[in-house]
């Protein structure tokens, strides 16, 4: 095993995902690649609106991007000594598709992700990402439960 991807949603599952991925990376001498996926800007074209009609959406998305990058940098700083944290990247788009693309790009041998996100909507979304990864089975997939789950 040479490359492990840790998919991070910044929920209460994130510390466990990072700990498990880092432990596996250290045990196998593998590179650790961190990924967080930011949802794309909402579009309301079905209602006849264009994104340019709502500059606040762009401002909100840019602020979300900055905060996500800051949080990703904070999490990357928590990677233990002895683990090669090769990259910490922020992607935008569909979480499942972005994760699949990242795994292919990095030629990862394994992915570690949390079973549920934060909040009702996020937990459904992240749950569906975990389920999608297991179904696609591009690489071995380790799903780490959030504290209090299971």
Range-by-range predicted roles:
Residues 74-111, 148-150:
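Structural beta-alpha unit
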Residues 10, 110-132, 150:
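Glycine-rich, Arg-bearing micro-motifs that act as flexible, cationic patches
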